[in-house]
A protein has these predicted regions:
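An accessory alpha-helical subdomain
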Residues: 230-232
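N-terminal FAD cofactor-binding segment of flavoenzymes
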Residues: 5-64
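Conserved mid-domain beta->alpha element of the FAD-binding
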Residues: 244-255
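Predominantly flavin-linked oxidoreductase catalytic cores and closely associated redox partners
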Residues: 9-13, 93-228, 240-245
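A conserved beta-strand/loop capping segment in the N-terminal third of enzymes
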Residues: 40-102, 106-112
Protein backbone atom coordinates (compact mmCIF):
# COMPACT_ATOMS: atom_id res chain seq x y z
CA UNK A 1 0.00 0.00 0.00
CA UNK A 2 2.76 2.45 0.86
CA UNK A 3 4.35 1.86 -2.53
CA UNK A 4 1.16 2.69 -4.41
CA UNK A 5 0.56 5.78 -2.26
CA UNK A 6 4.10 6.89 -3.05
CA UNK A 7 3.43 6.32 -6.76
CA UNK A 8 0.37 8.56 -6.50
CA UNK A 9 2.41 11.33 -4.88
CA UNK A 10 5.23 11.06 -7.42
CA UNK A 11 2.95 11.03 -10.43
CA UNK A 12 1.06 14.07 -9.16
CA UNK A 13 4.32 16.04 -8.84
CA UNK A 14 5.51 17.70 -12.06
CA UNK A 15 9.14 17.15 -11.05
CA UNK A 16 8.76 13.42 -11.77
CA UNK A 17 6.84 13.78 -15.03
CA UNK A 18 9.70 12.45 -17.15
CA UNK A 19 11.10 10.00 -14.60
CA UNK A 20 10.72 6.26 -15.22
CA UNK A 21 9.08 4.41 -12.32
CA UNK A 22 8.98 0.63 -11.84
CA UNK A 23 6.61 -0.82 -9.23
CA UNK A 24 7.32 -4.39 -8.15
CA UNK A 25 4.52 -6.19 -6.30
CA UNK A 26 4.39 -9.86 -5.35
CA UNK A 27 0.59 -9.91 -5.51
CA UNK A 28 -1.96 -7.94 -7.49
CA UNK A 29 -3.44 -5.29 -5.22
CA UNK A 30 -7.22 -5.36 -5.64
CA UNK A 31 -8.64 -6.58 -2.32
CA UNK A 32 -9.42 -5.14 1.10
CA UNK A 33 -6.27 -6.43 2.77
CA UNK A 34 -6.13 -3.57 5.27
CA UNK A 35 -8.16 -0.77 6.83
CA UNK A 36 -6.84 2.69 7.62
CA UNK A 37 -8.46 4.87 10.28
CA UNK A 38 -7.10 8.34 10.89
CA UNK A 39 -7.74 11.83 12.22
CA UNK A 40 -8.17 14.82 9.93
CA UNK A 41 -9.31 18.35 10.69
CA UNK A 42 -10.12 19.39 7.14
CA UNK A 43 -11.25 17.76 3.92
CA UNK A 44 -8.57 15.36 2.73
CA UNK A 45 -7.42 13.84 -0.56
CA UNK A 46 -9.27 10.57 0.08
CA UNK A 47 -12.61 11.94 1.31
CA UNK A 48 -14.48 10.74 -1.78
CA UNK A 49 -13.37 7.18 -0.98
CA UNK A 50 -13.83 6.93 2.79
CA UNK A 51 -16.25 4.32 4.08
CA UNK A 52 -17.38 6.42 7.03
CA UNK A 53 -16.62 9.59 9.01
CA UNK A 54 -17.35 10.25 12.67
CA UNK A 55 -17.32 13.44 14.73
CA UNK A 56 -18.13 11.86 18.12
CA UNK A 57 -16.37 9.21 20.20
CA UNK A 58 -16.77 7.17 23.36
CA UNK A 59 -14.09 6.11 25.85
CA UNK A 60 -14.60 3.43 28.50
CA UNK A 61 -12.65 1.97 31.38
CA UNK A 62 -13.54 0.36 34.69
CA UNK A 63 -15.91 2.78 36.39
CA UNK A 64 -15.53 5.34 33.59
CA UNK A 65 -17.66 5.96 30.52
CA UNK A 66 -17.87 9.25 28.67
CA UNK A 67 -18.70 10.62 25.23
CA UNK A 68 -16.91 13.53 23.62
CA UNK A 69 -16.86 15.57 20.43
CA UNK A 70 -13.86 15.33 18.12
CA UNK A 71 -14.33 18.85 16.72
CA UNK A 72 -12.45 20.23 14.83
CA UNK A 73 -11.34 16.73 13.83
CA UNK A 74 -13.12 13.87 12.17
CA UNK A 75 -12.20 10.21 12.42
CA UNK A 76 -12.24 8.51 9.04
CA UNK A 77 -12.25 4.88 7.87
CA UNK A 78 -10.70 4.00 4.53
CA UNK A 79 -10.64 0.50 3.01
CA UNK A 80 -7.68 -0.44 0.86
CA UNK A 81 -9.44 -1.87 -2.22
CA UNK A 82 -10.90 1.47 -3.26
CA UNK A 83 -7.48 3.12 -2.91
CA UNK A 84 -5.79 0.44 -4.98
CA UNK A 85 -8.42 0.73 -7.69
CA UNK A 86 -8.21 4.51 -7.82
CA UNK A 87 -4.40 4.62 -8.05
CA UNK A 88 -4.17 1.78 -10.56
CA UNK A 89 -6.89 3.25 -12.77
CA UNK A 90 -5.17 6.63 -12.85
CA UNK A 91 -1.52 5.64 -13.01
CA UNK A 92 -1.06 2.05 -14.25
CA UNK A 93 -1.02 3.18 -17.88
CA UNK A 94 0.76 6.47 -17.28
CA UNK A 95 3.79 7.38 -19.32
CA UNK A 96 7.06 6.02 -17.92
CA UNK A 97 5.25 3.83 -15.38
CA UNK A 98 5.67 0.04 -15.36
CA UNK A 99 4.11 -2.56 -13.07
CA UNK A 100 5.82 -5.90 -12.53
CA UNK A 101 4.31 -8.80 -10.61
CA UNK A 102 7.33 -10.54 -9.08
CA UNK A 103 8.81 -11.65 -5.78
CA UNK A 104 11.75 -9.64 -4.46
CA UNK A 105 14.50 -12.09 -3.50
CA UNK A 106 17.25 -9.71 -2.43
CA UNK A 107 18.10 -6.01 -2.30
CA UNK A 108 21.77 -5.11 -2.59
CA UNK A 109 22.48 -1.46 -1.90
CA UNK A 110 25.63 0.41 -2.72
CA UNK A 111 26.05 4.10 -2.13
CA UNK A 112 25.09 5.23 -5.63
CA UNK A 113 23.21 2.22 -7.04
CA UNK A 114 20.84 -0.43 -5.70
CA UNK A 115 20.27 -3.84 -7.27
CA UNK A 116 16.94 -5.61 -6.86
CA UNK A 117 16.97 -9.36 -7.46
CA UNK A 118 13.49 -10.68 -8.29
CA UNK A 119 11.83 -13.84 -9.56
CA UNK A 120 11.62 -12.10 -12.94
CA UNK A 121 15.20 -10.84 -13.16
CA UNK A 122 17.51 -8.16 -11.83
CA UNK A 123 17.00 -4.40 -11.87
CA UNK A 124 19.26 -1.47 -11.00
CA UNK A 125 18.32 2.04 -9.96
CA UNK A 126 19.89 5.15 -8.51
CA UNK A 127 16.86 5.51 -6.22
CA UNK A 128 14.85 2.66 -4.70
CA UNK A 129 11.97 3.02 -2.22
CA UNK A 130 11.57 -0.20 -0.24
CA UNK A 131 8.37 -0.98 1.70
CA UNK A 132 9.39 -4.53 2.66
CA UNK A 133 9.71 -4.86 6.42
CA UNK A 134 12.39 -7.11 7.89
CA UNK A 135 12.11 -7.18 11.71
CA UNK A 136 15.36 -9.05 12.37
CA UNK A 137 17.55 -6.01 13.05
CA UNK A 138 14.90 -4.53 15.36
CA UNK A 139 14.34 -7.75 17.28
CA UNK A 140 18.01 -8.74 17.56
CA UNK A 141 18.98 -5.78 19.73
CA UNK A 142 18.39 -4.65 23.32
CA UNK A 143 19.06 -0.92 23.24
CA UNK A 144 15.64 0.14 21.95
CA UNK A 145 12.56 -1.44 23.57
CA UNK A 146 10.05 -3.02 21.20
CA UNK A 147 6.37 -3.14 22.07
CA UNK A 148 3.80 -4.66 19.71
CA UNK A 149 0.41 -3.15 18.97
CA UNK A 150 -1.35 -6.27 17.71
CA UNK A 151 -4.96 -7.02 16.94
CA UNK A 152 -7.59 -9.08 15.19
CA UNK A 153 -10.68 -7.43 13.78
CA UNK A 154 -14.03 -8.67 12.54
CA UNK A 155 -16.37 -6.86 10.19
CA UNK A 156 -19.75 -8.08 11.41
CA UNK A 157 -23.39 -7.68 10.44
CA UNK A 158 -25.85 -8.11 13.30
CA UNK A 159 -29.37 -9.49 13.04
CA UNK A 160 -30.77 -6.64 15.13
CA UNK A 161 -29.74 -2.95 15.23
CA UNK A 162 -26.86 -2.91 17.72
CA UNK A 163 -24.69 0.15 17.14
CA UNK A 164 -24.84 3.92 17.37
CA UNK A 165 -23.44 4.85 13.98
CA UNK A 166 -22.82 8.47 15.05
CA UNK A 167 -19.85 7.71 17.30
CA UNK A 168 -16.86 5.41 17.50
CA UNK A 169 -15.98 3.36 20.54
CA UNK A 170 -12.44 4.60 20.51
CA UNK A 171 -11.20 2.44 23.37
CA UNK A 172 -12.98 0.24 25.87
CA UNK A 173 -10.56 -0.89 28.58
CA UNK A 174 -13.34 -2.41 30.69
CA UNK A 175 -12.24 -5.95 29.81
CA UNK A 176 -9.84 -8.37 31.54
CA UNK A 177 -6.36 -6.89 31.21
CA UNK A 178 -4.41 -10.02 32.25
CA UNK A 179 -1.46 -7.85 33.33
CA UNK A 180 -1.23 -6.26 29.88
CA UNK A 181 -2.83 -3.34 28.05
CA UNK A 182 -5.93 -4.63 26.27
CA UNK A 183 -8.93 -2.85 24.81
CA UNK A 184 -11.79 -3.14 22.35
CA UNK A 185 -12.11 -0.76 19.43
CA UNK A 186 -15.38 -0.48 17.52
CA UNK A 187 -16.15 1.49 14.36
CA UNK A 188 -19.88 1.40 13.54
CA UNK A 189 -20.63 1.80 9.84
CA UNK A 190 -24.39 1.75 10.45
CA UNK A 191 -26.79 0.30 13.02
CA UNK A 192 -26.06 -3.27 11.96
CA UNK A 193 -22.52 -3.22 10.58
CA UNK A 194 -19.28 -2.53 12.42
CA UNK A 195 -15.59 -3.27 12.64
CA UNK A 196 -14.78 -4.76 16.06
CA UNK A 197 -11.12 -5.17 17.03
CA UNK A 198 -9.46 -6.81 20.01
CA UNK A 199 -6.17 -4.96 20.53
CA UNK A 200 -3.17 -5.29 22.83
CA UNK A 201 0.03 -3.43 23.59
CA UNK A 202 2.46 -6.09 24.79
CA UNK A 203 5.80 -7.75 24.26
CA UNK A 204 4.42 -11.05 23.00
CA UNK A 205 1.75 -11.96 20.45
CA UNK A 206 -1.23 -14.25 21.08
CA UNK A 207 -2.55 -17.26 19.26
CA UNK A 208 -5.16 -16.22 16.70
CA UNK A 209 -8.07 -17.81 18.54
CA UNK A 210 -7.24 -15.85 21.71
CA UNK A 211 -8.03 -12.57 19.92
CA UNK A 212 -11.25 -14.02 18.55
CA UNK A 213 -12.28 -15.24 21.99
CA UNK A 214 -11.81 -11.67 23.21
CA UNK A 215 -14.12 -10.36 20.50
CA UNK A 216 -16.79 -12.99 21.19
CA UNK A 217 -16.68 -12.38 24.94
CA UNK A 218 -17.05 -8.64 24.41
CA UNK A 219 -19.98 -8.96 22.01
CA UNK A 220 -21.68 -11.40 24.39
CA UNK A 221 -21.26 -8.92 27.25
CA UNK A 222 -23.14 -6.35 25.17
CA UNK A 223 -25.94 -8.77 24.31
CA UNK A 224 -24.81 -9.12 20.70
CA UNK A 225 -25.06 -12.84 19.95
CA UNK A 226 -26.59 -13.09 16.49
CA UNK A 227 -24.31 -11.81 13.77
CA UNK A 228 -22.47 -12.76 10.60
CA UNK A 229 -18.72 -12.33 10.26
CA UNK A 230 -18.23 -10.69 6.86
CA UNK A 231 -14.44 -10.24 6.92
CA UNK A 232 -11.48 -10.73 9.24
CA UNK A 233 -8.24 -8.79 9.54
CA UNK A 234 -5.08 -9.11 11.60
CA UNK A 235 -2.23 -6.69 12.22
CA UNK A 236 0.92 -6.12 14.21
CA UNK A 237 2.52 -2.67 14.44
CA UNK A 238 5.90 -2.42 16.19
CA UNK A 239 6.08 0.49 18.63
CA UNK A 240 9.74 1.41 18.99
CA UNK A 241 12.35 4.14 18.68
CA UNK A 242 14.66 1.82 16.75
CA UNK A 243 16.51 3.99 14.17
CA UNK A 244 15.33 2.37 10.94
CA UNK A 245 16.60 5.39 9.00
CA UNK A 246 20.18 4.34 9.67
CA UNK A 247 19.69 1.58 7.10
CA UNK A 248 19.02 4.12 4.34
CA UNK A 249 21.68 4.82 1.73
CA UNK A 250 22.02 7.36 -1.04
CA UNK A 251 20.22 4.97 -3.41
CA UNK A 252 17.89 3.09 -1.01
CA UNK A 253 15.17 4.58 1.17
CA UNK A 254 12.95 2.51 3.46
CA UNK A 255 9.31 3.64 3.61
Amino acid sequence: ASGLLLLKALREDAFFENRSILIIEKEIKNKNDRTWSYWESLDGPFDSMVTKKWSKAQFCSQGLNFDFDLDPFQYKMLRSAVIYQDILNKHSRAKNTTFLQAEVKEIISKENLTEIVTSEGKFHSKKVFNSLFDPKAMMNQKRYPVLHQHFVGWFIKTKEPSFDSRKILFMDFDIPQLQETRFLYLLPIDKNNALVEYTLFSENLLKFDAYETGIVDYLNSKGITEYEIKEKEQGNIPMTCFPFEESNTQSLLYI
